[in-house]
Amino acid sequence: MTTNFCAIIGMCLTFCGSQSYAQTFSGGDISLGYAGLTDSDLQTSGYALNASGEVAMSRELSVQGDFGYTNGEIGGFDGDILSLAAHGIYNASENASFGIYVGQDSSDGESIKFYGVEGGYGYNQIKLDGYFGVTAIDSGPFVDGGLGDVDLNQLGLSATFMVNDIFTVSGSYDRIRLTDAIGANRIGAGVGATLRNDFELAAEVGRIEGDVVGYSDNATYANVSATYSFGGPRGATFEQRGIAKTLLGF
């Protein structure tokens, strides 16, 4: 896994440096983060490596690709999630963008598919991002006989405010629901500091809550991350939509 991963990163960096790529590449970012639950009986922590890149087809149309790898521990059990996604983006103006996305999270031979619509807006010191979509989970591993794919509605909103040229504050909310009685949500608040060469350090704390037919539980999470943006002033247009990013706090 490590050899393949290093090969992928090497090819991406080589591709980024080519002249033909620079003519169409409009933005991207690479981030490394660490997250964990702070008040749970289960020892839960892990790290995530995420990368996104965007290619402009024209002034209005662009395509974004996402790659994410998350490795974590829950109660002594180790696992990882590989996330791949693509976005089709329409840039309505310099400040507003709309898109559709489709992707898949994979872990131990099982997969979760997700797709939906999204929008983003940035003006002066404010950046907004939102999405609404469907997450399809194969119930086979969890229910005897299987029920096929179970579709869950998922939505999220995030806002970032630039306090000055260095510091930012942000907030986010993500929710996934099967019914009113079954679902989960995450709410978080964070701060960031942008250093030279578009390199940002950030930290976030928040709450994750789950509800299953009258029974609910919640826990506090915290994460830290380092992100390098390149090719454009904002990196890739949209955030990643995989489960590890949207609901697990990575």
Question: At which residue positions do the language-model features occur?
Answer:
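Cleavable N-terminal export/targeting peptides
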Residues: 1-27, 231-250
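Short glycine/proline- and aromatic-enriched beta-strand/turn motifs that initiate or cap beta-hairpins
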Residues: 21-73, 248-250
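Repeated loop/turn-to-beta-strand initiation elements of outer-membrane beta-barrel proteins
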Residues: 25-28, 59-65, 90, 94-100, ...
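Residues that define the transmembrane beta-barrel architecture of outer-membrane proteins
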Residues: 26, 43-49, 78-84, 111-115, ...
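Transmembrane beta-strands of outer-membrane beta-barrel pores
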Residues: 32-40, 67-73, 102-108, 113, ...
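Residues on the lipid-exposed face of transmembrane beta-strands in outer-membrane beta-barrel proteins
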Residues: 51-55, 86-90, 117-121, 157-161, ...
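Detector for outer-membrane/organellar transmembrane beta-barrel domains
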Residues: 111-178, 186
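Flexible, glycine-rich linker and terminal segments associated
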Residues: 179-180, 198, 213, 221-250
